[in-house]
Amino acid sequence: MSWFTDLAGRAEDFLNLVDQGAATALKTKDGNDLIMDSITDYSGNFEEKQKTTEKYQSQAKSSFISSAADNIKHQKATMLAGTANIKTGTRSSIESSHNSSVNVSSHRSTTQFVRQKKSEPDDEQLFDFLNSSDKVHSSSQKETRKESASVNQAVKPISQSVTMAEDFHNTTEDAGVPLLPELGITEPVVKAETLSDSGSSASLSTTGDPKSHELSNLRLENQLLRNEVQSLNQEMASLIQRSKETQEELNEARTRMEKWNGDNSKNDRTARELRAQVDDLSEAMAAKDSQLAVLKVRLQEADQLLKSRTETLESLQIEKSRILQDQSEGSSIHNQALQTMQERLREAESTLIREQESYKQIQNEFATRLSKIEAERQNLAEAVILAEKKHMEEKRKSDDLQQQLKTSKVGLDSLKQEMADYKQKATRILQSKEKLINSLKEGSGIEGLDSHSASTMELEEMRHERDMQREEIQKLMGQIQQLKAELQDVETQQVSEAESAREQLQDVHEQFATQQRAKQELEAELERQKQEFQYIQEDLYKTKNTLQGRIRDREDEIQKLRNQLTNKALSSSSQTELENRLHQLTETLIQKQTMLENLSTEKNSLVYQLERLEHQLKNVQGSSLNGTSINMSVIESNEGARMRNVPVLFSDSDPNVAGMYGRVRKAATSIDQFSIRLGIFLRRYPIARVFIIIYMALLHLWVMIVLLTYTPEMHHDTPSGK
């Protein structure tokens, strides 16, 4: 509110000028002219500022309305006190016109308006002038009238604005909406009113009694202006009321929006629940449809079985009639046939018993072979471990012998070096002795004889030492030869041990190679088993895909049924039909659950079979690490036992085979054997099985395409009549 403080400061300055002009108006005319010029200038500035304030008030009205309600409670008491002081001040200013300066100062103090006080000499001069002679009063009466009129004209816009502000303040106070403190208008209004009253009192003091009429006119104008301000305050109150109403409407709209949002959320929740119910019903319908399809398929199968059984029943009835006829024709043939059949039955039972015994024997042989193979494998493993231990010991011994050989070689070299050193030393000693002997021989006289005896003694000693050294040399040579012989023995022993170790290593390598081959064969068998498992998985995946395709088709049908249900619900939805449908869907769901349980049990059984096969494969890997030929023979024997266990339709050992019956029996047995061999082949080679499955699938697909796309030709020619 800087503009308002500026406006208040200017109004204060203006009122100070008015007071000073009123005090000095009676003294000089030049001063009055100066006051009038300043008043007119300041009034123009005041009007411009008032326009700017009106614009600002129009712009800040919206913010003022929102902030006024918050400051009502805090400023209401201060406003009431200020307005009370204002009213008392105005009344006292009107009653005491002679003491206007004192009343003005009291009004300024009550309204908390700080203004410079008028100097006491000016007031004294004013009173002296008023109490002066009549001539001066009469001579200056015209001038004072003009000056008071000009002053009143100058003060009039200010008093109008002040009265408007005061009336606005009073109306807002009566309405209980203290809006003026929000804008800071209370103090300037009081100031302006007090100053206008002071100005009017000053004019009254200057003019005296004849100006009472003008004062009444001014009061009327002031009353009119107050009425206008009151109307403006009423408009402001109405605007505030409208703003409150709009705020209440806004709150109501917000509550409505919250209610609408809650209703929308409830509707969305109910829609989701209904969708979930529809989905559950559709799933139940799909389950019911799938159960109906299964029931239809079972019904068709039952019809086919019924037809086949009726056909077999008819054929049996025909055979029965024929048998009865044959029995009536000759019971002897029947008895013979019965005896032959009994004999064949006995033979079949005996062959069955023999096959069972042979199968048991084969199983026992297989168990014994497996035990032998395991024992051999354990023995071989122990032998390999012992051979490795022996090899390590021989290696360690050879290392020790090599170290001994190295030490002996080093000792021999040292002995050779010592022998050479000793030989050199002996040769040097002998040379020195010979030189000494020669020198002694060359001597003469007595000294020669003494020296000769001494030299002979020394020579004998030297010879004795030489003999000793020769003996030592011979001993050392014997030791050297003995060490050489030991070294040769060690080398020969090491070579023989190395050869034996090589032979053992070769044996171990051969055994390892055989085990590797057996391992590779078992790995190949494992790969075949894995391929079979993969084929089974692929079959399961294909069945899963087909079932998913069926599920999609059922979902499409469910969507159609949903549309039909929605149409029915729109037309007429009966509760009984829905309950019946729900009951049917629950039944289909129960059937589907039973089917799923059956499928899960089948899956578990397949998984158990697969685990059993893997366990058997691991056992085969563990048992046949070293005997592949034995395992193959066992497998062949198992296949032979399987061939023997397969029931043969007709035995070839019947001697009484003749005619068409014998040929048919041979053909049936050959077909049976071929089918058995084909089954064994397919069981052994899963790739061939896959190719056959693909071929059959393509063949059936081609047949279906031909049946569905074939259109028979329509011959419109008339028959020839033949």
Curated annotation (Swiss-Prot):
Residues 134-148 have a biased composition (Basic and acidic residues). Keywords: Coiled coil, Golgi apparatus, Membrane, Transmembrane, Transmembrane helix. PANTHER family: GOLGIN SUBFAMILY A MEMBER 5 (PTHR13815:SF7), GOLGIN-84 (PTHR13815). Residues 91-109, 195-209 have a biased composition (Low complexity). It is found in: Golgi apparatus membrane. Residues 711-722 are lumenal. GO terms for cellular component: Golgi apparatus; Golgi cisterna; Golgi membrane. This is Golgin subfamily A member 5. Pfam families: Golgin_A5. It comes from Xenopus laevis. It is a single-pass type IV membrane protein. The gene is golga5. Residues 1-689 are cytoplasmic. Residues 211-622 form a coiled coil. The chain crosses the membrane at residues 690-710.
